Amino acid sequence: MKSRKSGFTLVELLTVLVIIALMMGVLLPALNLVRNTAKKAKQEVQFATIEQAIMAFKGDYGDYPPSNNLYGDYEGAQQLAEALVGWDLMGFDTDSAWRSNGCLDAAGINWIYPPQPLDLTDPVVKKNLEDRKGPYLELSKANVFRLGNTVNGPGLFNNTGALNPDRYVLCDSFGAKNLILKNGTKTETVIAGTPILYYKANTSSKQWGPPGSVNKRIYFDGDNRALVSLGRMTDGKPHPLGGITDPFPSMGFPANFYYYLIDQKMVPIMGQYGWPVNADSYVLISAGADGLYGTADDITNF
């Protein structure tokens, strides 16, 4: 009588592999859902922390941080970072002119924030630092990164267009890009999220829908238009928030931004264009897990 050989047959092995593949097909989406839910919760906590920091800033400064692009190279996301951690990450100077060069003038002659590297033996520099406010966020937990790659260090984008690449932004909790930070002979890899968009409401305006100039409305897309136009951080894919496919194209370019901020509860009162959310304060927008502004997974403060 022949002895039976031990082991699995090919059919049995294939069956096991099919079962494993099916289980992975079920488990992986579930794991991704759990992971994204955890990141969403973390992002909501970050927004709560930022909102507390903004209120502390307002208490010192008398107003919310601005979100304009008066000089073409410095927008709302960057101005929020200056307000909460400082132009040079060393706290906010209440004399700020909100320029990307940290000076009173475009030529960079009359500085508000001292030139870098900071000379701590200079009494003028020491006094400047002593008079600063904040930082209002703990720097190690602020998720703050340089906007672009420069000789001064790595950043989120290789090309920042018209925006000053050396200025900082606060990033969300959805890791999108690895950055290698160097400190002497040591290197550290950190995961940076997508920049958090910040828009301050124009509380003196009572204009939202057409007619009228878009930059006179309660919120103005131009406050972060250059940053949004860079596309998704990982591949440059256009952000839906910057599009014009909205049902109300007459609201002005980009119409999607204005539709995105409509408080639907106000439509029966104000008509089809409604009224914006947070009309007396500000808006924060995280691109969410997909890294795109203007999609269903965005996290906002409204």
Name the predicted role of every residue range:
Residues E44-F302:
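N-terminal pilin/flagellin-like segments and related low-complexity appendage regions
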Residues T15, R35-K39, G72, Q272:
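Conserved aromatic-histidine-acidic binding/catalytic patches
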Residues L31-V34, A38, I54:
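Hydrophobic helical segment of the DHp/HisKA dimerization and phosphotransfer domain
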